[in-house]
Amino acid sequence: KKTGIVQFSFPHEGDKWATHLVFDEGDISVKLGPSEDEPTVELAFNDIDHFNAFFKGTSMKLPQFRHVHHLNWVVPVVMGLLKMQKLLSASEPPADEETKALMVKLMFYLLPSGISQLNKAGHPEVVKWAKMSPDRVYALVVDGRDDLAGYIRVKAGKTRSARGAYKRSQPFFTMRFTDLDAALGVLLQTADMLALTAQKRLIMEGAPEFGAQIGDFMMLVGQYAQK
């Protein structure tokens, strides 16, 4: 468990674009924009194409490493991110159960977080949806796995995503899976949702029309992740 800040940046249209990860004793939060505090390490890319190609795995050209206060951060952070990107860009589920669980966990973290970030970045459809929403929670869970859960809370234009199950009250809508294969089948769009629903391996708790709406936003995030 580490504590520090890892920043990723590149120049764009005369400005510096950046995002950073804040590590706090095992907890990780994603922040848009440059860090107000000096990063523990910064990965500075030449441009947006270099950034995208590196994390898509189509280029092994390394970025510049700046503010390197702890060399032991660099390799595990980069290797971990590349492994995450490989899993998130996969089109077929992995064979072993451990990697399946890791892929589901990453997607359950990515999708709510991605929707929240699109709202904060001003995506028109997401912003409109968030502004019109009362206080609601949308959740993703796998039965029997407390570690495989994530949610997004929406209220009057503001969004916040988090890992784990939402326990303060019953979520407004929950997409519940009975097993890893059912979850990956839906997340990777390789399974028939109607068939999984009929088999009771996919259970939608809440209003279906709102589930379809949040599902569209999840697909949007997935498309961005694989570009």
Question: Model features per residue range: what roles?
Answer:
Residues K1-K227:
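Feature captures hydrophobic
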